[in-house]
Amino acid sequence: MKESVQEIIQQLIHSVDLQSSKFQLAIVCTMFNPIFWNIVARMEYHKHSLTKMCGGARKGCYMLAATIFSLGIVRDMVYESALREQPTCSLITGENWTKLGVALFGLGQVLVLSSMYKLGITGTYLGDYFGILMDERVTGFPFNVSNNPMYQGSTLSFLGIALYKGKPAGLVVSAVVYFMYKIALRWEEPFTAMIYANRDKAKKNM
């Protein structure tokens, strides 16, 4: 059984063109985006860089939101373009894999879009780093089924596209997406908790 699993993994790996410049660019874009928005958000929190540049916290947040959204569009386009050049693999092609890909992509989009609807622009795009805090924690769907629906939904969407197209390279990119979001959460969750703890502490001292 172990040998068969190893053979499957080897076949999937051999179906990835690691030398493709578009594939490499897709990896770079996937890694760059969360690093970028975390660095910019930290700079905003400590130095109010975007607030000063844009003439207000809300305007600064909207600027960051537009930038992150645009970078996401570019990343998705690069991903799609990279997959077109990559070979398919018989291990993940066929009607069932296609249906699974559609289902995962659909689920991912539901999580992403419903999360954005619940949080709004400032809640989705790091408004708390600008001092734009939510009154209370959102607990309704999709947050009652997922702790981080934006990140998990995005990962599922990448995975769904990979399976729909039968491209092992897409599985690699999806794995990078997953691990980059895991790393991002290690930065974001404690920092966000600190921001709200400071807000609550300030309220008590008033």
From Swiss-Prot:
Recorded catalytic activity of this chain's protein: a 1,2-diacyl-sn-glycero-3-phosphoethanolamine + S-adenosyl-L-methionine = a 1,2-diacyl-sn-glycero-3-phospho-N-methylethanolamine + S-adenosyl-L-homocysteine + H(+); a 1,2-diacyl-sn-glycero-3-phospho-N-methylethanolamine + S-adenosyl-L-methionine = a 1,2-diacyl-sn-glycero-3-phospho-N,N-dimethylethanolamine + S-adenosyl-L-homocysteine + H(+); a 1,2-diacyl-sn-glycero-3-phospho-N,N-dimethylethanolamine + S-adenosyl-L-methionine = a 1,2-diacyl-sn-glycero-3-phosphocholine + S-adenosyl-L-homocysteine + H(+)
PROSITE patterns documented for this protein: SAM_PEMT_PEM2
Chain ranges on the Cytoplasmic side, renumbered to this chain: 75-101, 187-206
Subcellular compartments: Endoplasmic reticulum membrane; Mitochondrion membrane
Enzyme Commission number, as recorded: 2.1.1.17, 2.1.1.71
MF-aspect GO terms: phosphatidyl-N-methylethanolamine N-methyltransferase activity; phosphatidylethanolamine N-methyltransferase activity
Gene Ontology process terms (BP): methylation; phosphatidylcholine biosynthetic process
Principal location: endoplasmic reticulum
Upregulating conditions: Expression is repressed by inositol and choline. The 5' flanking region contains two copies of the CATRTGAA motif and a 5'-AAACCCACACATG-3' GRFI site, which are involved in the regulation of expression. OPI1 and SIN3 play the role of repressors for OPI3 expression whereas UME6 is an activator of OPI3 expression.
PANTHER family in alphabetical order: PHOSPHATIDYLETHANOLAMINE N-METHYLTRANSFERASE
Stated role: Catalyzes the second two steps of the methylation pathway of phosphatidylcholine biosynthesis, the SAM-dependent methylation of phosphatidylmonomethylethanolamine (PMME) to phosphatidyldimethylethanolamine (PDME) and of PDME to phosphatidylcholine (PC). Can also catalyze the first methylation reaction of PE to PMME in the absence of PE methyltransferase CHO2.
Protein name: Phosphatidyl-N-methylethanolamine N-methyltransferase
UniProt source species: Saccharomyces cerevisiae (strain ATCC 204508 / S288c)
Taxonomic path: Eukaryota, Fungi, Dikarya, Ascomycota, Saccharomycotina
